From Swiss-Prot:
Top-rank taxon, per record: Bacteria
Cellular component annotations (GO), alphabetically ordered: cytoplasm
A Pfam family that the UniProt record links to this protein: HGTP_anticodon
Reactions performed catalytically: tRNA(His) + L-histidine + ATP = L-histidyl-tRNA(His) + AMP + diphosphate + H(+)
Predominant localisation class: cytoplasm
Protein EC: 6.1.1.21
Name used for this protein in its record: Histidine--tRNA ligase
GO molecular function: ATP binding; catalytic activity, acting on a protein; histidine-tRNA ligase activity; transferase activity
GO biological process, one term: histidyl-tRNA aminoacylation
Entry-linked Gene3D superfamilies: Anticodon-binding domain, Bira Bifunctional Protein, Domain 2
S-S bonds: none
Subunit (UniProt): Homodimer.
Keyword Cytoplasm: yes
Organism: Lactococcus lactis subsp. cremoris (strain MG1363)
């Protein structure tokens, strides 16, 4: 049997995980600056949670969800997106309670699963940063979260990221727009794709999100939601735009944007990058004020986004941004002879307890081969430990680049290596 990873998945080897760790560290710092707290939810949940949250007519439910019946007869689905799980956790753990400070600001970094045709930047197991802000409705909340995504792109050095903005209005506005859209699309019903014909009367806004060529041509001239906003929705959107302008965050209005999920209302947005001549969405989200209540929680306004990490890395590579920090090792211990093995183990642990990054040889190779390994690992200092060093307790600590060396004792290293480290680097500091 040939063992290989499932189609649409990827192995992240050490060279790649170093990039991921760098991005995750930057993201964690940005989210912390905005006072968001990390949440971790199960990788699988009840199928109904996702089907109800994302919409029965959405592509996620009809085409992409990984679902199965477990041994207890429960209908389970692998998580296709993070918002539904965060909302479920918010309700189940009573984060809506009056003693909990509002808004509740949550972020996560998690794998998601969708059965899609694998291609560049789109895998069946992919990873997202997600943020959810629950408990307050204010245009400033929307803009703060959009600004947070913008800050993350800037701190990562990603350029050419453009903000696309729209509003879906409140329930009253959407109802008026829904009817206008049905009236417009009905004469074209026979020209629409099969999926769009099915969605026409169930959820006509989904037609605007279609990627089929025949649908794109028809919706190009469809009425815009902006023409059907009531005064409340219009005023809300105007304030969102004014706040973005106050922060010097440029945006364009895309009146056909609806996002791929059914739970959005009012502000929605996407951050888009031109990638090989095509527009690639790297981050998207919006307001979802009815979702908590839809799942029998209290009425709770909310706003959030998801950001694809694989796509972020793909864009960074295209823009020649190096996310791999230079790997260095403080100390490499070259070991010669069986009698030095025990002392090398003790020495390595002692140095690590003193907060130095250490590697040692385990193969009892010739010194030349060990020194080459130290070079490959980027070791700053080398300690050679043989049977003579163990017997006398005298050792030499050598700088791998300058070749400067200091003679000392094993006991001194165990007691405190920092002064020895500083002595070797004294000439560089001066």
């Amino acid at each position: 049997m040939k063992l290989q990873k499932p189609k649409g998945t990827a192995d992240l080897l050490p060279a790649e995980t170093a990039k991921w760790q760098y991005i995750e560290e930057i993201a964690r710092g940005v989210f912390n600056d905005y006072n968001f707290k990390e949440i971790r939810t199960p990788m699988f949940e009840s199928y109904e949670l996702f089907s109800r949250a994302t919409g029965e007519t959405s592509d996620i439910v009809t085409k992409e969800m990984y679902d199965f019946e477990d041994k207890g007869g429960r209908h389970i689905a692998l998580r296709p997106e993070g918002t539904a799980s965060a909302v479920r956790a918010y309700i189940e753990n009573k984060l809506y309670a009056p003693e909990v400070v509002k808004p509740v600001k949550l972020w996560y970094d998690a794998p998601m699963f969708r059965y899609e045709r694998p291609q560049s930047g789109r895998l069946r197991q992919f990873h997202q940063f997600g943020v959810e802000c629950l408990g307050l409705k204010n245009p400033a909340v929307d803009v703060e979260i959009i600004a947070m995504a913008d800050t993350l792109f800037r701190q990562l050095g990603i350029s050419g990221v453009k903000l696309s903005l729209n509003t879906l209005g409140d329930m009253e506005s959407r109802k008026a727009y829904r009817q206008a859209l049905i009236d417009y699309l009905t004469p074209f019903e026979n020209q629409l794709s099969e999926d769009s014909r099915r969605r026409l009367n169930e959820n006509p806004l989904r037609v605007l999100d279609s990627k089929e060529a025949e649908d794109i041509a028809i919706v190009k001239n469809a009425p815009a939601i902006l023409d059907y906003l009531n005064e409340t929705s219009k005023a809300y959107f105007e304030e969102v735009k004014a706040l973005l302008e106050a922060l010097n965050i440029e945006y364009t209005i895309d009146s056909n944007m609806v996002r791929g999920l059914d739970y959005y209302n009012d502000t929605i947005f996407e951050f888009i990058v031109n990638f090989d001549g095509k527009e690639l969405t790297v981050c998207g989200g919006g307001r979802y004020d009815g979702l908590v209540e839809y799942f029998d929680g209290p009425a709770t306004p909310a706003f959030g986004f998801g950001l694809g990490i694989e796509r972020l890395l793909m864009i960074a590579e295209k823009q020649e941004i190096n996310f791999i920090p230079e790997e260095t090792l403080d100390v490499y211990i070259a070991v010669m002879g069986e009698k030095a093995n025990l002392e090398a183990t003790k020495l390595a642990e002692s140095l690590r307890e003193q907060a130095f990054k250490v590697e040692r040889d385990f193969s009892n190779r010739k010194l030349g081969a060990q020194f080459k390994t130290a070079e490959k690992l980027g070791a700053e200092l080398i300690i050679t430990l043989g049977e003579d060093e163990v017997r006398t307790g005298q050792i030499k600590v050598k700088h791998n680049q300058t070749r400067k060396q200091v003679e000392t004792t094993l006991q001194a290293v165990h007691e405190s290596f920092a002064p020895i480290f500083e002595e070797i680097y004294a000439d560089e500091i001066n």
